[in-house]
Structure formats: C-alpha cells, structure tokens
Amino acid sequence: MVRILGIDPGTAIVGWGVLDCDEHGNIQKVVSYGHIATDKELSTCERLDEIVTNLLEVLDTYKPQEVGVEELFYFKNAKTVISVAQARGAILHTCFSGGLTVAEYTPLQIKQSLTGYGRADKEQMQEMIKSVLKLNNVPKPDDTADALAVALCHINSRLYTKKINN
C-alpha cells in the first residue's frame, strides 16, 4: 500500500488530497482531502509560513510516502505567477526536506491522465474525480478537487513507470 498526497499550490488556497493505492494502482481509499486558506491581509512571508505550518500538519497527520505537485502554467498576471511560484517553492522544500519523493505534473499531464484529453475543462475534470473516487459530491473549493486530480495523476504515472521498468 502506498499513500499519495496530491497538492494544488497557490498563495490564497492550497488544495490537498490523500489517497491510498495498491502496487497495481488501484485506489484503496480516499483518506482525506481539504485546503489551506491564507488571509490576503497577511504579508507574503506570513502567508508562506501559514502554508508550511499547515502542510506540516497534513504531512504529520496522514504520513504520505509520495507527493505529486501541480506545476505552474501560464498566468496573464506576472504578480500571480510570482506568488504561486513562491508557494510552490515552500511546498516543494517542505516535502523534500521531509524525505518524501516529490513529482511534478503540468496541468496538461493531469488532464490527460484523468480524462484522456489534455484540454479537458474544469467541469469534466471534476466529474471524473467524483466518478473515479466514488464521491457523492465534487470536493470544494476547486483547489481541493484539483489536488485529488494531481494525486490520481501521480498514481497513474507511477504505474506507467513501473510497467516500463519491468
């Protein structure tokens, strides 16, 4: 059994989702999911500290063995890119320094992995997450659903890598 943490990084909201899978990539359990929200009135350093503190709590509580993190994609606003990059850096460092295996996936890879189509829209992705994980509702906020998609992508990626290596 392998425990996977998927993370959708952001400065305002960081989505996270924890899944257990077997060595064949079969989802055994949706362990938990949620989000870390930061106050926009806080300074950048305070927001990053809040993200790290809460992420450490998630890591300590659920003890994942591997982590998948969404990579940055194109933003029209340069300030948004910078702040999300800072959050990603804090997240990557926290996971890596905790001894975890960390993999990064583009939005295209995540969509392709889950729907078979790299240009799937948000609604298609959310319905797939709900269906694959047998959830009653789509997790909210969207960042949480996105984090579960990252975890599913990581499970599919590790299974594909295992098949190639055998």
Spell out what each predicted region is.
Residues 1-166:
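Phosphate- and other anionic-substrate recognition elements at nucleic-acid/protein interfaces
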